Regions:
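Conserved internal helical-beta-strand scaffold that buttresses enzyme catalytic cores
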Residues: 1-158
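Short, surface-exposed alpha-helical segments at coil->helix boundaries
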Residues: 159-163
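Conserved small/polar residues in nucleotide/adenosyl-binding loops
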Residues: 169-175
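Short helix-loop-beta junction
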Residues: 164-168
Length: 175
C-alpha cells in the first residue's frame, strides 16, 4: 500500500483456497463453515460447490488498507485467469491507471495446470497488448506434481520446468 498499490485480485483453483480465504482475506471460519452447513443466507444461490465462491475484504497492512478479492472459480481449471486479468484491466481503465500501479493481479496455479492448460498460454500471449495489458501479474506455481496421472515425470511435459512456457514471451520490467 505504501507504494500506491491499493488492491489485489486473486485467481486460484480449489487447492489451498479455503486457507487463502481465512488466512489471507480474513474470512471468519464460522462464516465459511456456515456456507458448508447450509446455514448461511444465500441471496442468489449459485448452484456451485461452496469452495468455488468468491470473497473480498479490506486488509490492514503497515502501509495502509488494501482491498483483496478472490475471484469466483468454476470447475474449469485455470479459466479464472483471464477473468482476473479482465477485472484488473477494468479497474485500471476506471481509475485512469494506464500503467497498472494500483491493483495487482495474482494467479495461483498447480504445475500441471500451468503447463497443460492452453488458457494460460493464451492469457500470457495477450499480456503485453494494448487492450489487455495490466502492468504485470504475479504467478504463484505450486509444484506439487500431482496434476497428471502418469507415473513417470518424463511423461508430464516436454520441458524440465512447467514455467518454460513463459520463455516464449518477453516483458519490459521497466514498465
Amino acid at each position: 500500500a505504501s507504494a500506491g498499490l491499493d488492491g489485489a485480485a486473486i485467481g486460484m483453483a480449489h487447492r489451498g483456497r479455503l486457507n487463502v480465504l481465512v488466512n489471507s482475506l480474513g474470512k471468519m471460519p464460522k462464516d465459511l463453515f456456515a456456507e458448508f452447513d447450509h446455514t448461511a443466507p444465500e441471496d442468489l444461490p449459485a448452484g456451485d460447490v461452496k469452495y468455488h465462491q468468491g470473497f473480498s475484504s479490506d486488509v490492514t497492512t503497515p502501509g495502509g488498507p488494501v482491498h483483496l478479492s478472490l475471484a469466483f472459480n468454476p470447475s474449469h481449471l485455470e479459466i479464472v485467469n483471464p477473468v482476473v486479468e479482465g477485472s484488473v484491466r477494468a479497474r485500471m481503465d476506471r481509475r485512469a491507471d494506464p500503467h497498472g500501479k494500483q491493483v495487482l493481479p495474482v494467479l495461483v496455479h498447480g504445475d500441471a495446470a500451468f503447463a497443460g492448460q492452453g488458457v494460460n498460454q493464451e492469457t500470457l500471449a495477450l499480456a503485453q497488448t494494448r487492450g489487455y495489458y495490466t502492468g504485470g501479474t504475479v504467478h504463484i506455481i505450486i509444484n506439487n506434481q500431482i496434476g497428471f496421472t502418469t507415473s513417470d515425470p518424463r511423461d508430464t511435459r516436454s520441458t524440465l520446468y512447467c514455467t518454460d512456457i513463459c520463455l516464449l514471451y518477453t516483458s519490459d520490467a521497466a514498465d
